[in-house]
Swiss-Prot record:
InterPro entries: Ecotin_C, Ecotin_sf, Prot_inh_ecotin
The protein's name: Ecotin-like protein 3
Pfam family, one: Ecotin
Low complexity biased stretches: 362-378
Amino acid sequence: MPSLQDYHVPYPAAAPGQVRKVIYLPQQNPTVEQQHLRVQIIPGRHENCEDGRLYKLTGSVTEETLQGWGYSYYVVKLGDIYAAHRSSSDPARVTTFVALDENPVIAYNSKLPIVVYVPEGAELRYRVWTDDTSLVQSIQQQPEAPALPQPHLVPVTERQECPHELPRCGAPGEYVTQDCKTSMLSVEEVHRLSSSTPPLIPSAVRGSAHEAHAAPPLHSAELEERVCPVMEHLEVCPQNNGHEGREQPAEEASTLKRRSSSSSSSNPRHHSANEPSPSRPRLSSTEYWPHENSKTKRSPSATHKPRRSTDSAAIEEAGVGAPKKNRSSSSSASSKRKAEDNVYEKTMKNFWNRARSDSPRKASASSKKSGNGSKADP
């Protein structure tokens, strides 16, 4: 621990009735000492406080400067005691430290000691204050904790990898070779077995699963042979008016052919392909479009000959293939319309002629009335 003589500073000796106290501060970073640290001087003395009340001392702390050196020292004067407040203290400790009412705060300087002159029987305490920045730096400067010893790792033996080729056992190999030697059944044998087995009945279905699966499956070629003869006797009707196609026997298809041919020869009606007749029976896929006869075909020149009549518009509206009755009716309707138009024109002409003939008569009548009035006035 350093002494006051180590600093070679001539501090004055203590006056009678006083004691010199010296505080030595630990050395810190100069910037931290100047900006982040402060020292609080707390002088006081021990007093008997039997009532358990807290007290304080009156007095003062004065700062003086050493002449010729410029160093500072402090002189403390203590006065009477007084009760600070009625908060309870430790009743077991009757004699307690009573601090001075004034506790000055000074700068932190580790290069020079803090010299304080206090009265005899007094005690000097101090407190170092710091801010958050210095606290963080002190925490960062603390030595790191020693690393914990790593646990001893026991080496683990590596597992042997399974070989790619496993040893073959005797029994499975024999079973596989025996299975490969069996020859596959031919199509004829499958057909013979399937023909010999009777069809399933409800009693057979209720049997065990072993009996149900006893019959061997049919080959694809055999299935095709069995399905084709059935399809030969059926004809599929085309889909018409949003209804799905239906299968009809060949006999019904032949009867439909006869009916359609007889109806087409007797009643030559013109229908569009998109408007199906409800009374006409459905045609089969082969008879959907009727065959055209070369004898019944007409050349476009024969059917579409230009005509010089004034009713060409009515003929075009009625259609090229319309009968003579329709043409005559259309011509009569057009002639009626023309006659009506002529009558309307005649009536309108007569109306305008009457209106024109009536206008001068009214004017002459008004002039006659005015002349008669003028003569009657004189």
